[in-house]
Curated annotation (Swiss-Prot):
The gene is lepA. It is a peripheral membrane protein. Residues 50-231 form the tr-type G domain. GTP binds at residues 62-67, 178-181. The lineage of its organism: Bacteria, Bacillati, Actinomycetota, Actinomycetes, Mycobacteriales. This is Elongation factor 4.
Length: 653
């Protein structure tokens, strides 16, 4: 081994020395003052509540929430340039591909105002109508909300819905216009629109660009000044609200909480107040923006808990966590104000390969922890075999759940057409709840009740006529109309939920050239003249194709489905009738023509009686085949007939 001589050793700088810049060359301007001392300040927990600000960003889908959150992460120094990526907080592949936020994410940010260090907890929320429950749970953990509006598009229906959710919880609202760098931006006009709705002055509306970062530091300053600090009693028994929970393959259930009273430390025994289940805390930590273990969480702080529990039903969103280890004991009463999310749409999910049924059950178990609103129960279909009847918040929720099952768990699935929940009163006085057309009672039905929703549509005023026509064709009743500005109008309708869960949104977008936005909320139920339409193949009902539709549109639905199945089902050796029926009454019919083998091909000339004999023999065979033959519906036909597009045709109920 060669060793360099002492002269060479002296001349060569040490590895440590090479890292240190010369005092003369040190650039004192970079990095900014904001970054160095504070990140270490934010990593310490048990921060005084007066120095904490909990806030969320609420906006319509695609108004730039995640991009603004990216700029905040960079500006506060918690993510460096090298590890930065677009939509940093959107962790799922589906979120990144579709450019939407599905899960609410939280992150702890350091910030300094007037030489005082603060900790900001930012909760990035989804904007789509299906994920309103994610927004409501994020709002429970905050004292303030940044209301973000696209300076080129203005206020949309979803913005209003989330704003009302925030006002219900008495959150302080900071109005902000985003995308002011766009050539099409009109900030003055939309600032006046926001001021009109919130009740502030147009000058108070902040203007930022999530893309360039312009105005973001001013926004963070305003969050510190305007959002009230969290209130809570540090000496009271521990109470923390679960606002999200995820399943980690290696660590089990990771529960995200906001501490309201007391404090939480590792190695304590905690209790979930709704179930009474107790666990030992293995780890307590903060998200900044990657998870970091810490000594514990104090009043007003947001972080995560790991108990090592693998059962996905042990950590319910909206539940209250309390500590059993402290001298003060467990809390006497749970936190209030959270509603369990209720499924609005039901659909059957079946594995294409029947042997995947146990895998589908395990996959749904794991997804349910991430997704508090997903419900499911086993069901059997004659046509599709074993599967699950799943409850979803809406059609996008259903599509994304199915896509996650297929992508994350490698399953191949068929989903049946979506249904809402109907209440059916029979003549004998009994009442049943129907989420599946195959549960529809046969015989005398006195009344049927269907869920209705209050729908808000915001669109340019030139499209009023076409929107009204669409809503009336879907049995909607106009509740009111307001002009937000001379160019934009808000329409309020009461509509059956069954009419809007299929293709209403697509039809609305196509009729308004994509300018309309939609929001809906539950509004009870109403009596309706509904019937069950069965699709019969060879005289036998195929349960997967049955649907509950309004009496006036049953004939159109029957026609549409029989025509579609005639194209999708391959021809058999015998003629197959495809019929649509209400009870025993046939309302539509198509025939799938038989494939005919040429039995005369071997007869070259000869007597006609020979040919007739062969044809009669073929006819007898076809007749016998028709009585004993079964129609095999290929998997592709089920997929095509039950796809969302096909369901969209059914939406004309």
């Amino acid at each position: 081994m060669r060793t360099p001589c002492s002269q060479h050793r002296r001349d060569r700088p040490s590895a440590i020395g090479s890292q240190l810049p010369d005092a003369d060359t040190l650039d004192t301007r970079q990095p900014p003052l904001q970054e160095i001392p504070i990140s270490s300040f934010a990593d310490k927990t048990f921060t005084a509540p007066a120095q904490i600000r909990n806030f969320c960003i609420i906006a319509h889908i695609d108004h730039g929430k995640s991009t603004l959150a990216d700029r905040m992460l960079q500006l506060t120094g918690v993510v460096d340039e090298r590890s930065m990526r677009a939509q940093y907080l959107d962790r799922m592949d589906i979120e990144r591909e579709r450019g939407i936020t599905i899960k609410a994410q939280n992150v702890r940010l350091p910030w300094r105002v007037d030489k005082t260090d603060y900790v900001l907890h930012l909760i990035d929320t989804p904007g789509h109508v299906d994920f309103t429950y994610e927004v409501s749970r994020a709002l429970e953990a905050c004292e303030g909300a940044v209301l973000l509006v696209d300076a080129a598009q203005g206020i949309e229906a979803q913005t209003l819905a989330n704003l009302y959710l925030a006002l219900d919880r008495d959150l302080h609202i900071i109005p902000v216009l985003n995308k002011i760098d766009l050539p099409a931006a009109d900030p003055d006009r939309y600032a006046a629109e926001m001021a009109h709705i919130i009740g502030c002055e147009p000058a108070e509306v902040l203007r930022v660009s999530g893309k360039t970062g312009e105005g973001v530091s001013d926004l963070l300053d305003e969050v510190v000044r305007q959002v009230p600090p969290p209130q809570g009693d540090a000496e009271a028994p521990t109470r923390a609200m679960i606002f999200d929970s995820v399943y980690d393959i290696y660590r089990g259930v990771v529960t995200y909480v906001r501490v309201v009273d007391g404090k939480i430390s590792p190695r304590e025994r905690i209790m979930m107040m709704s179930t009474g289940a107790t666990h030992e805390l293995l780890e307590v930590g903060i998200v900044s923006p990657e998870p970091k273990p810490c000594e514990g969480l104090g009043v007003g702080e947001v972080g995560y808990l790991i108990t090592g529990v693998k059962d996905v039903r042990q950590s319910k969103v909206g539940d209250t966590v309390t500590s059993l280890s402290r001298a003060r004991g467990a809390a006497a009463e749970a936190l209030t104000g959270y509603r369990e999310p209720k499924p609005m749409v039901y659909s059957g999910l079946y594995p294409v390969d029947g042997s995947d049924y146990p895998n589908l059950r395990d996959a749904l178990d794991k997804l349910q922890l991430n997704d508090a609103a997903l419900t499911y129960e086993p069901e059997t279909s004659v046509a599709l075999g074993f599967g699950f009847r799943c409850g979803f918040l809406g059609l996008l929720h259903m599509e994304i759940t199915r896509e996650r099952l297929e992508r994350e768990f490698g399953l191949d699935l068929i989903s049946t057409s979506p249904n809402v929940v109907y209440r059916v009163h029979k003549d004998d006085g009994t009442e049943i709840r129907v989420t599946n057309p195959s549960d529809w009672p046969e015989g005398k039905i006195r009344t049927v009740y269907e869920p209705v929703v209050k729908t808000t549509i915001i669109a340019p005023s030139e499209f009023i006529g076409t929107i009204m026509e669409l809503c009336q064709s879907r049995r909607g009743e106009l509740g009111g109309m307001d002009y937000l500005s001379p160019e934009r109008v808000e329409l309020r309708y009461t509509m059956p939920l069954g009419e809007i869960i299929f293709d209403f949104f697509d039809a609305l977008k196509s009729r308004t050239r994509g300018y309309a936005s939609l929001d809906y909320e539950e509004a009870g139920e109403q009596e309706a003249a509904l019937v069950k339409v069965d699709i019969l193949l060879q005289g036998e009902a195929v349960d997967a194709f049955s649907a509950i539709v309004h009496k006036d549109t049953a004939y159109a639905y029957g026609n549409k489905m029989t025509t579609k199945l005639k194209e999708l089902i391959p021809r058999q050796q015998f003629e197959v009738p495809v019929q649509a029926a209400i009870g025993s009454k046939i309302i539509a019919r198509e025939n799938i023509r038989a494939i005919r083998k040429d039995v005369l091909s071997k007869c070259y000339g000869g007597d006609i009686t020979r040919k007739r004999k062969l044809l009669e023999k073929q006819k007898e065979g076809k007749k016998r085949m028709k009585t004993i033959g079964r129609v095999e519906v290929p998997q592709e036909a089920f997929v095509a007939a039950l796809s969302t597009d096909a369901a969209g045709d059914k939406g004309k109920k």
